[in-house]
A protein has these predicted regions:
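Cytochrome P450 heme-binding "Cys pocket" and the immediately downstream C-terminal segment
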Residues: 53, 144, 273-275, 393-402, ...
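C-terminal helix/juxtamembrane-tail motif
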Residues: 451-477
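Central I-helix of cytochrome P450 enzymes
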Residues: 130, 197-209, 232-284, 311, ...
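Cytochrome P450 heme-thiolate monooxygenase catalytic core
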Residues: 56-64, 98-262, 278
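Conserved cytochrome P450 K-helix E-x-x-R motif and the immediately C-terminal K′/meander segment
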Residues: 2-20, 203, 291-332, 353, ...
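Conserved cytochrome P450 K-helix/beta-meander segment immediately N-terminal to the heme-binding cysteine loop
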Residues: 344-371, 473-474
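N-terminal membrane-proximal hinge/A-helix region immediately C-terminal to the signal-anchor transmembrane segment
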Residues: 1-65, 82, 105-110, 338, ...
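Classical protein tyrosine phosphatase
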Residues: 34-44, 53, 140-145, 149, ...
Length: 477
């Protein structure tokens, strides 16, 4: 595992190891609590969710750069709730997600062909796959072959979001009064940087929204969240503004988190060839080698289901979640003043030895058998009132006792890309000068993290598998 240098979640884990699962301190003169266990997180963020649903103030990111209107950074208010309602209506039940299965299969097969043709650009292909899926649902936008401007726009915006939200990087987050400095003064470079970030965010919101409006005017709009609401009678300026930001939340947030986990899948398979082989054996025994798996095969592939669940535990895209208390509270005799910063260490919760046996191992078997270990659940998809609005979209049940747990839209797409990639490709460490190159598990980023770029050997399992990828792609067009 990486060192603690620059990894906030590892530093917080060390802090919890010294001071306990409910550790108090001070950050920027604000009372701060670091939560290091699922029990404490559930006691506060679930059972007392009304008091733990807001975000800490972010001057650089939320105010100067404008990201505070995105659900990720918005406080829990009417604005947040209206966005959640819009998104949940679009992807909030098994039936609504099932109608997207064919489209998800099309985009996944398109990605397999791209990986087959140019495996060196794996990260770009993965990024485009999930962004394409989200854009179809949020704006009815079909990405073009090769590099697509809206895919690249989301990538740029998310990189800037990560910079703008980095703890302690900008002095204005420490001294908020600095936000009123004229941008031409020495030391006010953050104002110019914020203006740059805000311009990209404006493009992220406005360009796809205006695309939908032009398609509606031409009578060529595809079904989407945006086209549905824009086409309803009685649309007000206020509702349209809310819609723009709700759709942008899907476009930005859904794509970034799913991309992060999907890219990590290839790293996991390189580092754990035993798991790859076992998953391929299950696929071959259940569906054979004359086709690629589809969503209809999902209930018959329990090991693959466990593999995807373990992937979410092993590489959660959001290692830290942040909240702020609205009113005074008390927990186990400790006073929690209003306005306290709450940091929940998701990374630590998913590696807690009290919950998971040998938690640093990638072992899907932990979720199978008569006594499975707890699935990631809330730790992956959010606690309380800030839970991902699409968390339950792939199951009719909310119970964690169900054999196929409901996750969010990205989980469905993630399952399919894992299933079809395993059916089509052998994934292994690259070899250079006769020696294997062993990649490192190295997370980079702040709010949403990604694996640092790595080299990977991806080859068709056979000539028949290569032909199958191309055939499946052409049949789905």
């Amino acid at each position: 595992m990486p060192s603690t240098d620059g990894k906030v979640w590892l530093q917080m884990h060390d802090f919890s190891q010294q001071h306990g699962d409910f550790a108090c301190g001070s950050l920027l003169w604000v009372h701060t609590i670091v939560i290091g266990s699922a029990k404490v997180a559930e006691d506060l963020l679930e059972k007392r969710s009304a008091n733990y649903a807001d975000r800490p103030r972010s001057v650089m990111c939320g105010e100067l750069s404008g990201w505070g209107k995105i659900m990720l950074l918005s406080n829990y208010n009417d604005w947040f709730r209206s966005h959640r309602k819009m998104i949940a209506r679009e992807i909030g039940s098994y039936a609504t997600v099932a109608k997207f299965h064919r489209m998800i299969e099309f985009e996944t097969r398109r990605t397999l062909r791209c990986i087959l043709d140019d495996p060196a650009r794996l990260q770009a292909h993965v990024r485009k796959n999930f962004t394409s899926i989200i854009l179809r649902i949020s704006h009815g936008y079909v990405t073009q072959e090769g590099d697509d401007p809206l895919v690249e726009l989301a990538h740029t915006a998310n990189a800037q979001l990560s910079m703008a939200s980095a703890p302690g990087l900008f002095y204005v987050d420490i001294v908020p009064l600095l936000k009123y400095m004229p941008s031409w003064l020495p030391g006010a470079g953050f104002k110019r940087k914020a203006k740059e970030y805000a311009a990209v965010l404006d493009d992220l919101v406005e360009i796809p929204h205006n695309y939908v409006k032009s398609q509606l005017a031409a009578g060529t709009a595809l079904p989407s969240l945006s086209s549905r609401i824009l086409g309803e009678p009685g649309l007000t300026d206020e509702l349209e503004d809310s819609l723009k930001w709700a759709a942008a939340t899907m476009y930005q947030g859904g794509a970034d988190t799913a991309n992060s986990v999907a890219y990590a899948f290839y790293l996991a398979m390189m580092l754990h060839p035993r798991v790859l082989k076992k998953a391929q054996e299950e696929l071959d025994s259940v569906i054979g080698t004359n086709r690629l798996p589809t969503f209809a095969d999902r209930p018959s592939l329990p090991y693959l289901e466990a593999l995807v669940t373990e992937l979410l535990r092993w590489h959660t895209p959001g290692p830290i979640t942040m909240r702020r208390t609205r009113v005074d509270d008390e927990y186990n005799g400790y006073f929690i003043p209003a306005g306290s910063f709450i940091f929940v260490n998701i990374w630590a919760i998913l590696r807690d030895e009290r919950t998971y046996t040998n938690p640093l191992e990638f072992r899907p078997e932990r979720f199978l058998g008569d006594n499975p270990e707890p699935r990631p659940g809330n730790a992956c998809f959010g606690f309380g009132r800030r839970r991902c609005p699409g968390k339950l979209v792939d199951s009719a049940s909310t119970s964690d006792s169900e054999p196929f747990p409901g996750y969010f839209l990205g989980h469905s797409a993630l399952w399919l890309i894992c299933a079809q990639a395993l059916g089509a490709f052998d994934i292994s460490k690259p070899v250079e000068n006769g020696a294997e190159i062993v990649p490192e598990f190295n997370l980079v980023g702040e709010i949403i993290v990604h694996q640092a770029p790595f080299r990977c050997s991806i080859k068709p399992r056979s000539l028949e598998a290569e032909a199958l990828v191309r055939q499946e792609f052409s049949l789905s067009e």
